[in-house]
């Protein structure tokens, strides 16, 4: 079995310390990733973790591209607590478009501090030390699972005669702009709300989230709200001049613009018929993973 050792930090403030855990941490706690000794590199897609049961998502890459395995086993523990023990979890691989993909799992971070995650995969036969450092607050900065989010007046197709005024999508699905977030939270239907800017999706963990949302919508007969909220309020103005970008009011109301690295990433929320958030996804979420979340709110 191969082993990736990934160190993540969950902390309230920047630590003034040097931590030497299995010889892999130094005093540069805000670095995100380090290549392993054989070129395999983990890339953490969920960089905004906080105390509680959280979805983590990560990519594994090598010189040939994405490392793919059906599942990997995770051993997670708090490394500063003497009574901490390994929590064993399984991360499942989900295909993304364009030959990419990521592993996801739910992990219970019961207190802030440094956490160690060892990743085992059965198609390798060597120890591959690597690490990821994570930086977050104790509490979630944005609408969390179990909460009712802001009732934002997001833009709809009726607000403009040109769809390019409300989305940067190249081939927009106009049905994703039928109703506002405010209306969706009050019409007693489950909702899937994606905040994304398709034209400015450039990071390794970004993907065609709006396309995935549209595909998922077309696969359901059940009455659901599917909404895309463009990150920027003036899409047409910024195609040639990104300095002119204005953040959409809904993005500010949901506090997504307060997160590190927020500009290139998407956030997707699945809400029940009462308008309560049941699932929250940072970065790209595949249609299959999103489908599982939607099915859970339909059943309940």
PLM segments and residue spans:
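Typically the conserved alpha-helix immediately C-terminal to a functionally engaged Cys/Sec
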Residues: 203-220
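Thiol-/selenol-based redox modules, centered on thioredoxin-like
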Residues: 143, 155-161, 276-300
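C-terminal motif of bacterial Sec signal peptides marking the signal peptidase cleavage site
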Residues: 15-18
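Thioredoxin-like thiol-disulfide oxidoreductase module
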Residues: 231-265, 270-274, 296
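Short active-site neighborhood of thiol/selenol oxidoreductases, capturing the structured segment around
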Residues: 162-167, 173, 181-202
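Thiol-based oxidoreductase modules, predominantly thioredoxin-like and allied folds used
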Residues: 195, 221-240
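Contiguous segments within soluble domain cores/interaction surfaces
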Residues: 23-114, 118-164
